[in-house]
């Protein structure tokens, strides 16, 4: 197998990082849905009633908002540390 050039290695690292981010995002979505399902769904049926749909939507929205706020705050801390 031929050795990778510097540019090829950088591209490979970028692709691996992108795939890791996708996997992390997917895992996070599944985690949110599992937590929200346990919180909101009392009796699974053929269809979700409007109360359950609203609960699931609000629950996931709260988790996303919280994650974004924490990520933003962490980025601010990192940026201040780099100055």
Curated annotation (Swiss-Prot):
It comes from Homo sapiens. The keyword Acetylation applies. Probable mitochondrial intermembrane chaperone that participates in the import and insertion of some multi-pass transmembrane proteins into the mitochondrial inner membrane. Also required for the transfer of beta-barrel precursors from the TOM complex to the sorting and assembly machinery (SAM complex) of the outer membrane. Acts as a chaperone-like protein that protects the hydrophobic precursors from aggregation and guide them through the mitochondrial intermembrane space. This is Mitochondrial import inner membrane translocase subunit Tim8 B. The twin CX3C motif contains 4 conserved Cys residues that form 2 disulfide bonds in the mitochondrial intermembrane space. However, during the transit of TIMM8B from cytoplasm into mitochondrion, the Cys residues probably coordinate zinc, thereby preventing folding and allowing its transfer across mitochondrial outer membrane. SUPFAM superfamilies: Tim10-like. Pfam families: zf-Tim10_DDP. Belongs to the small Tim family. The keyword Manganese does not apply. A motif (Twin CX3C motif) lies at residues 36-59. It is found in: Mitochondrion inner membrane.
